[in-house]
């Protein structure tokens, strides 16, 4: 289990959020004003977002989709980036109810790839044309952080003709600032960590056991990642 840091805290006001989504739906004029505001690309308030989530009118919903499409294209452009997942291990100490890798699932085979196997998998992906990878593994003491760093280096070292991996995005369990600083040195792309739910009460239900059961440690992971120098999360 991760040790609790003194500055880990639940900064989400659960009661406020539920109050917002249970309010009377906004009028058409109010929704139109919010959508117009979003076109300025300056962001929306929590209150604005909660009103958009309550839209049931089909005409307003279509307007929402059109506005969202415009905002997406203005920020990201008309492009689609593909990446291939590379699972290097499915041993896990967590018991998340929705996940096939949960420790109580006895119906799957478990594996932890050797460095040579990781190179072989990377070579196969390169031959298929993939140059962007998402590397991930289950969370357990057997899958050490040093092993993960070695796996990154191995994947980056593979060459097939003139092709090599351009970018490895990383989905690894939350760690401390010092380890994030080590991860930064490996020239990773984006650091990814899913919370699954930001409702602390639901979180307890879906994550009953294991390191991931620590809601606040996971909730504050991006603060630690950025403190470690990772600027793409």
Regions found by a protein language model. Give the residues of each.
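Flexible, acidic/Gly-rich N-terminal and inter-domain linker regions that tether
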Residues: 1-83
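Short low-complexity stretches enriched in small and charged residues
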Residues: 4-7, 38, 53-54, 89-91, ...
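Short, functionally important structural connectors and interaction interfaces within domains
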Residues: 36, 45, 72, 83-84, ...
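Residue-level signature of catalytic and energy-coupling elements of molecular machines
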Residues: 41, 96, 193
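Flexible, active-site-adjacent loop/turn segments at secondary-structure boundaries
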Residues: 42, 86, 90, 196, ...
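Solvent-exposed, flexible loop/coil residues
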Residues: 48, 84, 90-92, 210, ...
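Canonical Radical SAM [4Fe-4S] cluster-binding loop centered on the CxxxCxxC motif
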Residues: 77-117
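Core AdoMet radical
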Residues: 103-119, 124-233
């Amino acid at each position: 289990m991760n040790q609790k840091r003194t500055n880990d805290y639940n900064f989400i006001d659960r009661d406020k959020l539920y109050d917002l989504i249970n309010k009377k739906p906004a009028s058409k004029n109010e929704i139109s004003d919010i959508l117009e505001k979003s076109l300025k690309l300056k962001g929306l308030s929590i209150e604005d977002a909660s009103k958009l989530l309550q839209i049931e009118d089909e005409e307003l919903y279509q307007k929402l989709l059109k506005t969202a499409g415009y905002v997406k294209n203005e920020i990201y452009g008309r492009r689609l980036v593909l990446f291939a997942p590379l699972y290097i291990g499915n041993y896990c100490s967590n018991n998340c109810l929705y996940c096939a890798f949960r420790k109580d699932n006895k119906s799957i085979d478990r594996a932890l790839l050797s460095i040579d196997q990781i190179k072989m998998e990377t070579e196969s992906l390169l031959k298929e044309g993939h140059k962007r990878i998402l590397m991930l593994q289950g969370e357990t003491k057997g899958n050490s952080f040093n092993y993960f760093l070695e796996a990154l280096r191995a994947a980056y070292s593979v060459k097939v003709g003139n092709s090599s991996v351009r970018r490895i995005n990383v989905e690894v369990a939350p760690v401390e600032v010092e380890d994030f600083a080590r991860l930064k040195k490996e020239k990773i792309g984006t650091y990814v960590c899913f919370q699954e739910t930001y409702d602390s009460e639901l979180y307890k239900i879906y994550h009953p056991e294991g390191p991931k059961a620590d809601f606040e440690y996971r909730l504050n992971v991006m603060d630690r990642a950025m403190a470690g120098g990772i600027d793409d999360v």
